[in-house]
Amino acid sequence: MSSDTFPTGALFTGIQCSTMHITDGDNTLLYQASHQHEEYGSGEWLHFTGTGYLIRLNAWRHPVLHLKRLGLSKACRRLVVTLMNHHPITLLHLDAAGDILPGIETFDW
């Protein structure tokens, strides 16, 4: 089956990078948010993977604003904005085994 036969919303693009690009505080907030079980909670777009997080950036019209409301750091939000501005991504996979992206701030926690 050719990829051009799928509806536009069926295809996802993403980037995987190291969790070193987020702070320890961001890690704590993402862990808590990804484990919410209420209907329409953050657990529907922030997913814990065991070694990081999968963030569905297309779940909200302004995902960075939602990350700010959750209390994530400017560095984390800057990472998301930078990646979204340079690449047409719908998913961000932050993973402990992910690559460190050049030119992006890192944290040793």
What name fits each language-model region?
Residues 9-11, 47-49, 86:
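A short, structural micro-pattern
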Residues 70-109:
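Short, compact, well-ordered microdomains
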Residues 1-27, 93-96, 106-109:
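Short, extreme N-terminal segment that most often corresponds to the first beta-strand
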Residues 25-59:
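An N-terminal amphipathic alpha-helical segment
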Residues 66-67:
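Surface-exposed cleft-lining segments at the edges of enzyme active sites
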Residues 3, 40-43, 77-81:
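Short secondary-structure capping micro-motifs at structural edges
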Residues 13, 51-53, 90:
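A generic secondary-structure signal marking the coil-to-beta-strand transition
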